[in-house]
Amino acid sequence: MRLNIAIFFGALFGALGVLLFLVAFGSDYWLLATEVGRCSGEKNIENVTFHHEGFFWRCWFNGIVEENDSNIWKFWYTNQPPSKNCTHAYLSPYPFMRGEHNSTSYDSAVIYRGFWAVLMLLGVVAVVIASFLIICAAPFASHFLYKAGGGSYIAAGILFSLVVMLYVIWVQAVADMESYRNMKMKDCLDFTPSVLYGWSFFLAPAGIFFSLLAGLLFLVVGWHIQIHH
């Protein structure tokens, strides 16, 4: 009975981990950024450029924000304009700087982002393989497949942990947003570009938790079957 309960919760946590990882992988809201279009101390309305990016795409669109409105709601699907500009995120690794980058720092950023992208792809592959192994293990009660699936879930959790850690380093250091901020403030002293982590970013830690938990449960199941059968 306890073995069946462990398998059930392992499958539940594994499914949640897979779902969260795939949504985080496929959505383009890892980073949310706003950039002022013009500054005016006399008006309460500002034209702002909104940026959001993920693994595949980086998109931006223009909007108007009133003084008491929150910029974050402009990124909600229903509040976005019907058309917006998008480019491949790998080819444009900075959330702002379209054509305004230093070639050396840009090349380094592309390499760093490429490494981050490879880790994310490996994490997605690992969690899909883990799910396949667990599905195959269930009919045969194979301790080897359960342990292999559990190990793959743990590997996926570790890989996505590295993805999250590298993305934080990316935003805080590698993207060199401070230089861009200083450049823009020459024209607009009263405005600082805003950069926030998006909901896609926060899905990844939740997926990591469920993936690691599922992996540990399936390892225990595999060891239990090996010892008692």
Curated annotation (Swiss-Prot):
Transmembrane segments: 115-135, 154-174, 201-221
Positions of the UniProt region annotated as Interaction with ITGB1: 49-59
Keyword Signal listed: yes
Localization per Swiss-Prot or TrEMBL: Cell membrane
Ranges of the Extracellular topological domain: 27-114, 175-200
Pfam families, A to Z: Claudin_2
Record-linked Gene3D superfamilies: 1.20.140.150
Major localisation: membrane
Function description: Negatively regulates myogenesis and skeletal muscle regeneration via its association with ITGB1. Modulates ITGB1 activation by decreasing ITGB1-LAMB1 interaction and inhibiting ITGB1-mediated intracellular signaling during myogenesis.
Record's protein name: Transmembrane protein 182
Species assigned in the record: Homo sapiens (Human)
Protein's gene: TMEM182
